[in-house]
């Protein structure tokens, strides 16, 4: 981000140059489907718990991001921009746009959240003594989407599978809940 700002490179030019790499993201998501398929029976048995956890994680992520933005004095436009930070990039940009945010800035926030989760998420949960790979995967996938899911997959296929389902369900739940959350938050702005 700093390089883009200092070099005065428009975000649209950056995204156009990054298109081949971004296209590979779709391929990597498909590659995550095999471990997910291998865990399908166990995931199907726990669908109510998984959906509850993912819904709460989506709400928590949106509210905490918005609250920090408000504490820092952000405008409603910036609150709408950071609200979808924990959804995968294409969905987050669309949600941001729908709420009146700035999709390009949202994309940067999503990348930062993904990098933080992929680098630190699995390690932090391990240090906290969380041993259930299902919980690790759901947590990391909920807050750091595809990048976090890849780091989970490298550490443990079961965690990666749960992270995959978490990133998909968080995208769905967040896009459904974001307008409601933003409306509630705007009451306090």
Regions found by a protein language model. Give the residues of each.
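Entry/N-cap segments of selected transmembrane alpha helices
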Residues: 20, 40-65, 107-116, 167-173
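Helix-loop-helix hairpins and the membrane-proximal interhelical loops
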Residues: 35-47, 70-71, 94-115, 127, ...
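Alpha-helical membrane segments and immediately flanking helix-loop junctions
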Residues: 78-105, 111-112, 116, 131-169
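C-terminal ends of transmembrane helices
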Residues: 32-45, 121-128, 148-155
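Helical membrane-embedded segments and adjacent short helical loop/helix-boundary regions
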Residues: 1-35, 45-53, 57
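Transmembrane alpha-helices that form the ion-translocation and gating core
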Residues: 52-92, 113-130
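Juxtamembrane boundary at the C-terminal end of a transmembrane helix
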Residues: 177-189
């Amino acid at each position: 981000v700093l390089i883009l700002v200092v070099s005065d490179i428009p975000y649209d030019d950056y995204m156009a140059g990054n298109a081949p790499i971004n296209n590979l993201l779709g391929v990597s998501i498909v590659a995550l489907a095999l471990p997910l398929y291998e865990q399908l029976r166990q995931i199907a048995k726990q669908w109510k718990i998984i959906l509850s956890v993912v819904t709460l994680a989506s709400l928590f992520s949106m509210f905490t991001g918005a609250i920090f933005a408000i504490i820092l004095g952000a405008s409603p436009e910036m609150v709408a921009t950071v609200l979808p930070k924990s959804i995968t990039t294409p969905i987050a940009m669309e949600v941001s746009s729908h709420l009146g945010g700035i999709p390009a800035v949202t994309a940067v926030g999503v990348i930062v959240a993904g990098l933080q989760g992929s680098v630190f998420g699995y390690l932090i949960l391990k240090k906290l003594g969380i041993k259930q790979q299902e919980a690790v995967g759901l947590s990391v996938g909920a807050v750091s989407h595809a990048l976090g899911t890849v780091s989970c997959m490298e550490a443990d296929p079961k965690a990666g599978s749960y992270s995959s389902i978490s990133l998909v369900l968080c995208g769905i739940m967040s896009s459904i809940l974001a307008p409601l959350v933003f409306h509630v938050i705007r009451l306090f702005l």
